């Protein structure tokens, strides 16, 4: 915990601190190395590695950035329409892709809209709510969902993609509808 608190002062990435802590725990821990390696959630780690590779490719090839450009073309710069498009597009994409590259792509877009005089506060909220709540729609939409699936399966209670989708997607849609109503009342 101290390492994470001091990583900025120490100029060490938090991933290095986490890895160092894991190695220390492995060395001083009472569990055998083999048991520890067997307890690692390898399918989840491999899944996220592959997901970040695919999403990274989409970012590098400009697919996500082109999608953001399409959103701007569709809305014509109208603030309320832009807010709703950002909310719904970020929710739907976050249900199927990792939301971090999408959010990272949308940040400069929203900043440039602010530079042009548009009130960006509603757009930040739309992006945040859409990206966060959209992850509830599918099993791969959020890291926690994938971890849940792995742990659940390991304990004899597998959750399939379709089982999760039947519950998660309607809940996501209801959440985004409620967010839309709130944001229209608050910002329109």
Residue ranges and their predicted role:
Residues 1-69, 167-188:
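Hydrophobic transmembrane alpha-helices of multi-pass small-molecule transporters
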Residues 14, 18-22, 48, 52, ...:
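Alpha-helical transmembrane segments of multi-pass membrane proteins, especially transporters
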Residues 128, 143, 162, 182-184, ...:
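Alpha-helical transmembrane segments of multi-pass small-molecule/ion transporters
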Residues 150-174:
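Interfacial loop-to-transmembrane junctions
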